[in-house]
Design a protein with these regions (language model features):
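An N-terminal assembly and electron-transfer interface module characteristic of large anaerobic redox
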Residues: 1-176
Length: 176
């Protein structure tokens, strides 16, 4: 599946002195070239080992004006020497909740379906079953209409579908 991904391009120097400069530059470049609403950053084995501090780096990028107004950078730690790819996926999903979920004390009769490591077809089936049960749900992440879609002959950098950031903000008010 075509997924837009970028790298901060560690060099020998950043391997020794840290990747802060590279990541701040990458954040600026990604926002200026690709114009996403959100950038999700995760660490690697090397950035974890040398001690890069994502909170500090993203704060620095914001202070320097590298994150445009209304845009967001979410992040999490995913050292490859802890757990597996599933652990990293779970950490990034937790970051989605941490950075977006808010509670207004107005409970919504909605069930949050937090999707674990699974295929888009499995997500689609879970949503279908919930629909048959007439349950109001919000699945996140939701890759059913973003990945596992028919070929149209036209490339879309950001396919329509999934859970929006506005929907993610409501998860703190869900009943379950």
């Amino acid at each position: 599946e075509p997924i837009v991904a970028s790298t901060s391009s560690f060099s020998e120097g950043s391997s020794v002195f840290g990747g802060s400069t590279n990541l701040v530059q990458s954040i600026e470049t990604i926002f200026s070239v690709y114009e996403p609403e959100v950038i999700a950053v995760h660490t690697t084995c090397l950035s974890e080992t040398i001690g890069d501090d994502l909170t500090q780096i993203v704060s620095k990028a914001a202070e320097e004006g590298k994150i445009p107004e209304g845009k967001q950078v979410i992040y999490c730690n995913t050292p490859s020497y802890v757990g597996s790819h599933i652990t990293g996926y779970a950490n990034q999903v937790a970051a989605m909740v941490k950075f977006f979920s808010t509670a207004t004390l107005k409970k919504r009769n909605v069930v949050n379906l937090v999707a674990g490591w699974m295929e888009p077809s499995d997500m689609r089936e879970i949503k279908r079953i919930a629909s048959v049960m007439e349950a109001r749900t919000l699945m996140f992440p939701d890759m059913t209409d973003v990945l596992d879609t028919p070929l149209t002959g036209k490339y879309e950098m950001y396919p329509k579908g999934g859970c929006t950031t506005e929907e993610l903000k409501t998860t703190g008010d869900s009943k379950f």
